[in-house]
Amino acid sequence: SRGLGDVYKRQGLHYPRGQKTVNTILKYKERFIHDFGESINSQFKAYYAIANNESLTNKSEYEDFMNRNNIPYSEVDPNTLFNSNKVEALYLTKEYSYSYKIVLNKLLNHISDVKNVDTFSGTKVISITDKNERYQIEIENGEYIECKGVVNATYASTNIVSQLFNKPGFNLKYELCEVILCKVPDTLKDIGITVMDGEFFSIMPFGFSKYHTLTSVHYTPHTVSSPEPSFPCMKNGSCSPHNIGNCNLCLHKPLTAYEAMKTQYEEFIHPQLHGIEYISSMFAIKPIQISSEKTDERNTLIQMAKQPPFYISVLSGKISTFYELDSYLIELINLLKGL
């Protein structure tokens, strides 16, 4: 899900109303590049446009936002990419996409080099017992795992897992989202375009692949649910609000919204950049902070129980902001040393 929820390593350029998110992204930008530089694709031109109608941010506000955050940009004639009168302003800047698979493999390789670490994937937790200041966790193969603390970083399942541990969850809503993978014409091959600030679209290179992703604020979320991730497709029994499955393996996932996204794209974009071709869809359940509905913030949420057995729950708003967890992990290690 994380790969779908954050397919771009952005600088925060699409959050002009989310200054706190931008601050955090910029704070950890260089650290992420240092740690995962091999995953980053910066070899394309990134364009950001302000829509002429129904944008929540205008030209002067967006330029003030970029200047305030020391983000370099140059203004470009909108007619080079867009149909007449569709956008108020167009900017060329530096942006990135990244390969989440490269990030994942690097982390897995790092874990494999560490002694006394066992990994379990695709494993369901059956029961959890709090005994003698330790957790006893029963997993579906009949084994028990005993530990002094738990870090819950399960993205869309964060509140589900917290409930298993009898811990409070975050105030969330859930979107069943679709990201389109598409083949683009040569005229768009090394270009990324984002239209703001409202129910518009973005088309960006997908890591180092030969494809682009196409997303739409209006069409990417198929269904919204709150306070639990409860969607009509779950009625078929492959998953439930208390046991989220892999949407991409599900036979009951929604029909694609590609045609609607393509139509929106072509309404804005100059005909010379038409001709995108559908390749596939990636579906996932995406958690959204209720508090961010108006501000568009994507802050990292962290809760910590400091009495044994210890428990940390984290929901990272953007891929590069997971470093916010550092201070909590250091505190947890010190607490464990004190036992």
Positions of predicted regions on the chain:
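A short coil-to-beta-strand element that immediately follows conserved catalytic motifs
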Residues: 42-43, 120-121, 172-176, 271-283
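Helical element adjacent to the flavin cofactor pocket in flavoenzyme catalytic cores
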Residues: 91-149, 153-162, 322-330
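Glycine-rich FAD pyrophosphate-binding loop
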Residues: 1-2
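Helix-loop-beta segment of a Rossmann-like dinucleotide-binding subdomain
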Residues: 40-50, 75-118, 136-137, 308-316
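C-terminal catalytic lobe of FAD-dependent flavoproteins
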Residues: 259-339
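Central helical "cap/lid" subdomain
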Residues: 144-196, 206-211
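Dinucleotide-binding Rossmann-like beta1-alpha1 core, especially the glycine-rich loop
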Residues: 6, 10-89
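Flavin-binding catalytic cores
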Residues: 209, 221-285
